[in-house]
Amino acid sequence: MVREEIAVSTRTLQWKCVESRADSKRLYYGRFMLSPLMKGQADTIGIAMRRALLGEIEGTCITRAKLDKVPHEYSTIVGIEESIHEIFMNLKEIVLRSNLYGTRNASICVRGPRYVTAQDIISPPSVEIVDTTQHIASLTEPIDLCIELQIQRDRGYRMKTPNKYQNGSYPIDAVSMPVRNANHSIHSYGNGNEKQEILFLEIWTNGSLTPKEALHEASRNLIDLFIPFLHAEEEGIRLEDNPNRFNIPFFTFHDGLANTNIRKKKKGIALKCIFIDQSELPPRTYNYLKRSNINTLLDLLSNSQEDFLKIEHFRIEDVKQILDILQKHFTIDC
């Protein structure tokens, strides 16, 4: 194993790109470092950056395709090697680069016999095809293939909605994720109280963005998320002004037991034998309850809203989730 030597700043927080390469038109790699950081800071930044890289960056992709005289998505056409479904899967993989907003139209209109590739897509000037060699279909006979396409910019993964097939137009599962993968690692150095950390970020993209561009965009998105906290006090924003605010009522085991619905529905069942892992609580809420030694429905109903909010990192939203679960499964009218 070769040890890597990297010069780091001992005072000013700095970042640098330590490795960058293009493995192919649709696979870029970049490795970045940030230092010096105090103990714990590298993990905080690394986790936030990875989530922002994978989930907050927008991408452009084909979201709908239309072919005339095609009865359904799994049809086949004489003279085309692939089924319509396979053609749609190939269109889904086409990597596009664009800063467009809203929806744009594109098209393919070719005559066989020939191979159809991404180069045959007639797109608006604002849309660039990253890899024009990407395969779409193989025409084995002298037939015409015309496909109308819809291009959209979005983020994340959006599954096609069932029963949205209109006039030969079919939705395509949209994968608007320019970052294919992201990892972070931490290197500690120094001794005792002087111990510091270096954060390493590895980013793989699909070619529509370079890793450096992805890092910048993810950073901007994170900053935008935190800006409201910086200006909340200046603008005099108060919790009472929030129209979406909700009040969580207090509840106890005795109040719940007095409710006739729960007594009828759960008659003869010892509440202490019903464990909270049977209640479909979200993992975050479940973990905090377990850490607080709340294991059964009896434990759950023996606590009030105030008791739950005393649990470290527990939020009003978590209490509301508990109420929703109780109302759903035990018919408690809170």
Swiss-Prot record:
One of its GO terms (biological process) is DNA-templated transcription. GO terms for molecular function: DNA binding; DNA-directed RNA polymerase activity; protein dimerization activity. Residues 268-334 are annotated as: Alpha C-terminal domain (alpha-CTD). It is found in: Plastid, Chloroplast. It holds the Pfam family RNA_pol_L. It is an enzyme of class 2 (transferase). It catalyses: RNA(n) + a ribonucleoside 5'-triphosphate = RNA(n+1) + diphosphate. Residues 1-232 are annotated as: Alpha N-terminal domain (alpha-NTD). Its EC number is 2.7.7.6. Keywords: Chloroplast, DNA-directed RNA polymerase, Nucleotidyltransferase, Plastid, Transcription, Transferase. SMART domains: RPOLD. GO terms for cellular component: chloroplast; DNA-directed RNA polymerase complex; mitochondrion. It comes from the Eukaryota. The N-terminal domain is essential for RNAP assembly and basal transcription, whereas the C-terminal domain is involved in interaction with transcriptional regulators and with upstream promoter elements. In plastids the minimal PEP RNA polymerase catalytic core is composed of four subunits: alpha, beta, beta', and beta''. When a (nuclear-encoded) sigma factor is associated with the core the holoenzyme is formed, which can initiate transcription. DNA-dependent RNA polymerase catalyzes the transcription of DNA into RNA using the four ribonucleoside triphosphates as substrates. Belongs to the RNA polymerase alpha chain family. This is DNA-directed RNA polymerase subunit alpha. It comes from Chloranthus spicatus. The gene is rpoA.
